[in-house]
Amino acid sequence: MTSSLKSRGCEVVLVHGGGPEIGELLKKTGKESKFIKGLRYTDKETMEAVQMVLCGKLNKNLVTLLKNAGGKGVGISGMDGGLFEAVKLNDPDGTEYGYVGDIVKTNPQIVLD
């Protein structure tokens, strides 16, 4: 896949999630995942698990897979370099989601440089 895209002059930015892996880590640490209206309620402890999974395990595994397929890449998170700016999710009915938010601005310069 990477060689096909490369031959066409394409540059790719891969954005990933990791819900199942986050749930698995939380379960291993004895914390139950809580979902409200389909969104994971994210308190401080859950946010730490999210960061470990997304910024650590999955990020590095994806970069390794890309490299092994003949591509090259670097793993960054949306928090790095202010890539994304977000505001806390404000549900009109007052539902509290913890650290869940909406991205309001993207600063792509970090990936363009």
Task: State the predicted function of each range.
Residues 1-113:
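Nucleotide/pyrophosphate-binding catalytic subdomain
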